[in-house]
From Swiss-Prot:
Pathway(s) this gene product operates in, as recorded in its UniProt entry: One-carbon metabolism; tetrahydrofolate interconversion
Gene behind this protein: folD1
Keywords: Amino-acid biosynthesis, Histidine biosynthesis, Hydrolase, Methionine biosynthesis, Multifunctional enzyme, NADP, One-carbon metabolism, Oxidoreductase, Purine biosynthesis
Domain of life assignment: Archaea
Record bears the keyword Membrane: no
InterPro entries the record matches: Aminoacid_DH-like_N_sf, NAD(P)-bd_dom_sf, THF_DH/CycHdrlase, THF_DH/CycHdrlase_cat_dom, THF_DH/CycHdrlase_NAD-bd_dom
The protein's name: Bifunctional protein FolD 1
Gene Ontology BP term (one): L-histidine biosynthetic process
Length: 297
């Protein structure tokens, strides 16, 4: 019988486990804090930032909310980041993407102090990840590692296929899977929009991570029997519902769950884990900045 990997439950367990470390840091005078910077009127971005703030409140992390008008000069955003970098009471900084077209997103990521880059996207932190010495693992790939672990799947020696090569998920996910570390040691293939014979490659996967952003591009016929399937996609498609749409993943769930050994649903799979690992990185950042050992789940 296929195991449905409950991302909400795993994320809740991680949040619960973080509370003791947060309390320890607070007792030492360093309650973790996370600053989220929003420069957008996009409703989805606003909702996501609000959810992150709720997560912080649940576990006892101080949430600092900064809104910048989307029409403001890029200099206002960079000045804000500079102030947050210099503020010793701020442990983590997250600029919600996407930023407006007149702001260059890579420049924004480079502007954040690498020690406070709890998304793990600063070039220094990307380099450390590739070198096998990650300071902060990017939240979504790290959350996926935790989901695979929760399903009792040992990645060592397995064939893993990552569909998607984004800087946010695909590339760092592949890097984590190949590393000589728990949750790694897999033989890993990265597929993308130019990959030929995609189905042939995905059918060889013991572990399949679908992160291409294409609705239901992977169906049951493309999956090896018993494979662990992690669906990162969250796509809005037209549907005969009250809202006029529904959310689907990159995997056609109904056919896939008939074949997979374990699978994440959409929603309720990877999404909650991304948010939980942001809290994880914020707690880790606080410990590193104040030279305090913290127990992390």
């Amino acid at each position: 019988m296929t195991e449905i990997i409950d991302g909400n439950a795993v994320a809740q367990s991680i949040r619960d486990d973080l509370v003791a470390s947060i309390d320890r840091l607070a007792d030492a005078g360093h309650r973790p804090s996370l600053a989220t910077v929003l420069m957008s009127e996009d409703p989805a971005s606003e909702t996501y930032v609000s959810m992150k703030q709720d997560d912080c409140e649940e576990v006892g992390i101080e949430a600092i909310d900064i809104d910048i008008d989307s029409d403001a000069d890029a200099a206002e955003l960079y000045d804000t980041i500079e102030d947050l970098n210099a503020d010793e009471d701020v442990n983590g900084i997250l600029v919600q993407m996407p930023v407006p077209d007149h702001v260059e997103d890579r420049s924004v990521l480079r502007a954040i102090d690498p020690m406070k880059d709890v998304d793990g996207f600063h070039p220094e932190n990307v380099g450390r990840l590739v070198a096998g010495d990650a300071r902060y693992k990017p939240c979504t790939p790290h959350g996926i590692q935790k989901l695979i672990e929760s399903a009792g799947v040992d990645t060592e020696g397995k064939d893993a296929v990552v569909v998607g090569r984004s800087d946010i998920v695909g590339k760092p996910m592949a890097n984590l899977l190949i590393q000589k570390a728990p949750g790694g040691n897999a033989t890993t293939t990265v597929c993308h929009s130019r990959t030929e014979n995609l189905a042939e490659r995905t059918r060889n996967a013991d572990i399949l991570v679908a992160a291409a952003g294409v609705p239901e591009m992977i169906d049951g016929k493309m999956i090896q029997e018993g494979a662990t399937v992690i669906d990162v996609g969250i796509n809005r498609v037209d549907a005969d519902t009250e809202k006029g749409y529904e959310l689907v993943g990159d995997v056609e769930y109904e056919s896939a769950k008939e074949v997979a050994g374990a699978i994440t649903p959409v929603p309720g799979g990877v999404g909650p884990m991304t948010r939980a690992m942001l809290l994880y990185n914020t707690v880790k950042a606080t410990g590193l900045q104040h030279d305090i050992d913290v127990d992390l789940p």
